[in-house]
Amino acid sequence: MKQYNDLFKIIHREGYIFIASFALVSFLLASFNEKLGCIGCIATAWCIYFFRNPDRFVPISDDLVISPADGIIQEIKEALPPPELGLGDVEMIRVSIFLNIFNVHVNRIPANGKILALHYNPGKFFNASLDKASIYNERQSVLMETAQGQKIVFVQIAGLIARRIVCDLEEGNEVKTGERYGIIRFGSRVDVYLPLKTALLVSKGQTAIGGETIIADFGRKKTTEFKFDRK
């Protein structure tokens, strides 16, 4: 029984219906045409791969902010946080992580702390790699206070293909770094907003691993002056 439980743990529950549907269609196609059945099996295998839910080795420290998602650090810039969270016109450092369809899409809590507010904002479905996706696309914004008293924001953003954001958090939740909290289906983006004086440990173009890559360290002084693009 444990082996079956382990199997289900490595696949996110949001994928069960898709995998079952793909498998059923593959079976039906195979009964009519062997080649179509093979194509269906490949599609089913890809679906299983997409919804994989691997364990990660999470750095443990109240000072650290880790990547909430797998992907490429697409942009680091000064930007206003989502207005729906009520943080005003104070700019923060925005670290944008782009996920392609081959990345793990399970999202993780970036720091120890408490969830202060959540807000779902319906919107467009522009390509998640575009800067305007942070403003106009469908998104789920989360404001939290870290164990060190810092307020940070992380945002799940739907993309051109992604059409469903899943967030399992509730206001008042006490959370731990690296805990799974949601998923975005089929290509997306996650933005992390940090205070301006935060010492960043990542750079544009770097590959991030959700739950493992350290984005920032509140215990360090900011020693590097980053140049930001204003667009």
Curated annotation (Swiss-Prot):
Sites of Pyruvic acid (Ser) modification: S188
Pathway(s) it belongs to: Phospholipid metabolism; phosphatidylethanolamine biosynthesis; phosphatidylethanolamine from CDP-diacylglycerol: step 2/2
Membrane topology category: Peripheral membrane protein
Keyword Nucleotide-binding assigned: no
Active site: S188
GO molecular function (one): phosphatidylserine decarboxylase activity
Co-factor binding details: Binds 1 pyruvoyl group covalently per subunit.
Free-text description of this protein's post-translational modifications in UniProt: Is synthesized initially as an inactive proenzyme. Formation of the active enzyme involves a self-maturation process in which the active site pyruvoyl group is generated from an internal serine residue via an autocatalytic post-translational modification. Two non-identical subunits are generated from the proenzyme in this reaction, and the pyruvate is formed at the N-terminus of the alpha chain, which is derived from the carboxyl end of the proenzyme.
Reactions this protein catalyses: a 1,2-diacyl-sn-glycero-3-phospho-L-serine + H(+) = a 1,2-diacyl-sn-glycero-3-phosphoethanolamine + CO2
Record note on quaternary structure: Heterodimer of a large membrane-associated beta subunit and a small pyruvoyl-containing alpha subunit.
Protein name in the entry: Phosphatidylserine decarboxylase proenzyme
Native species: Rickettsia peacockii (strain Rustic)
